[in-house]
Amino acid sequence: MAHRLPDRIPTIMDARDEVKDALMEYYAVDSFDKVLEILGAEEMYRFKTDEIVKLHFPGFEEQAERIDGPWMGGGQKYVRLDESTFQDAWGVVRRIGSDGKFVEWVSGPLVDASDPDEYDFPGVDRIIADPDLPDRIRSWKERGLFVRGVVSQPYKTAWILRGMENFLMDYILNRPFVEKLYDKIYALQGEILRICTAAGADLIGFDGDIATQNSVVMGPDRWREVDKPRLAAVVRSCRKINPEVHIFIHSDGDIREILPDLIEIGFGVIDPIQPECMDPEEVKREFGDRITLHRCGSLQRTLPFGTPEECRQEARRLVEGCGIDGGLVLGASNTVSFDVPVENIAAWYEAVRDYDLGSLPDQSR
């Protein structure tokens, strides 16, 4: 992130539990930490922000129970509606798919609302921050961990509450609804990020897709009108607390048309550079002096369907094309799922680990 050629290319991994188990078996070790040590990689999220900066939802705890499963969000508390359907603390209903591995969105509390005020949206007074958070972050840093505080992308929070089709139509037909809902979301998410920044997080940011593989989902002009100024205000407020804090955004899809805007706001870490719709080497050439490319491995082509040698070739190509002068954190472009052969994962990450960076020119010197 300092845009200097490092001693090695940092690598990061986010993987489903089934994949972690398969890698442990492949390397004949008894913990995923040992897998990471072998690969020279870090885990994407060791501690989730919502586990250390929580929200109070009156009455939820009394009704909720822990529901386990291999799907995203498994192992947390929900209100069970039937054998496969449950409601979270926000009032969002989801259903476990027939294979038991994924969940689908069913409904949200604002689906039929005419005004966001019809929903009891949590304000900043409902934030429950760990008073020992600064000490915890300090201890993590002393262990050599890079600490990030990341909240849900406000667009993602909004569509989950409202329904995606409804909320996208609101951008066109009911802009006041969008503006009012966003004001509530940004006030809450911004305060959580300010808490993380003040506590000493190295990086803060937003996690949630705002693009398809063709374009920004609400359109770049609408994003600039509605989303950009609000994102900019949150970034400014965090930078007032710590001017050196790194600013991160995660969105799958093609966000190249708004990359200059994100850079202008202050986003310096872009995750991922999804190779199916953005060429990492082109992004590096055009924007690489201003951003860090964070995860670029193909999860639609090479990792699930390539050979181990093709995985090695992709990894080496990314190091050679994007690693000059630093500004690169490599990894699969999203969560590694059970459709990826373990041999391919090992080949990809080992190729990055074993690459001799001495052959790359350091243009920062």
Go through each PLM region and give its residues.
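Active-site loop segments of alpha/beta catalytic cores
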Residues: 1-30, 34, 87, 93-96, ...
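Segments that shape or occlude catalytic/ligand-binding pockets
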Residues: 22-70
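Structural motif
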Residues: 57, 89-90
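Extended, Lys/Arg-enriched charged tracts that mediate electrostatic binding to polyanionic substrates
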Residues: 68-75, 128
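Catalytic and substrate-binding clefts that recognize carbohydrates or anionic sugar/phosphate headgroups
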Residues: 105
